[in-house]
Curated annotation (Swiss-Prot):
Protein name, UniProt field: Uncharacterized protein aq_1465
Taxonomy of the source species: Bacteria, Pseudomonadati, Aquificota, Aquificia, Aquificales
Signal peptide (UniProt feature, chain positions): 1-23
Highest taxon of the lineage: Bacteria
Record key words, sorted: Signal
Annotated source species: Aquifex aeolicus (strain VF5)
């Protein structure tokens, strides 16, 4: 039979091993939480110090000005959104047009079809003011 002192010693050893495993896991979890907290605080700092993007007002004159070098087919205003159709638009010009449009509104739908295979598109997009 096992002596009472041996049982107490084994119980104390087992308790020590379990407590050590719990403390090491807890410290890893604590480090994980600290890292996530610091990432969140950095995000809040960047969000509070970000510059607000100045947006112009979107109207038909602005759209005509942005597309003055392109072959404009039509501009339609319906339900608070502008539908613009262009013909024979180069891919580079299309990208720069979309970049400029982001300063005035949100491009909700874009259809660009290249039937030539040379990067010249027939474009239809719907843009709404923000």
């Amino acid at each position: 039979m096992i002596n009472r002192k041996v049982v107490y010693a084994l119980s104390a050893l087992l308790l020590f091993v379990y407590s050590y495993a719990f403390i090491s896991d807890f410290s890893e979890f604590k480090n994980f939480l600290n890292i996530q907290y610091l990432k969140f605080k950095e995000f809040l700092f960047l969000l509070n110090n970000a510059e607000e993007k100045r947006r112009g007002t979107l109207n038909e004159d602005v759209l005509r000005q942005l597309t003055e070098n392109l072959e404009l087919v039509s501009i339609r205003y319906e339900y608070g959104k502008y539908e613009v159709k262009l013909r024979k638009v180069n891919a580079v010009e299309l990208v720069s047009l979309l970049k400029e449009l982001e300063n005035y509104g949100k491009v909700e739908k874009l259809e660009a079809v290249d039937n030539t295979g040379r990067g010249i598109f027939d474009v239809k997009f719907i843009v709404s003011p923000l």
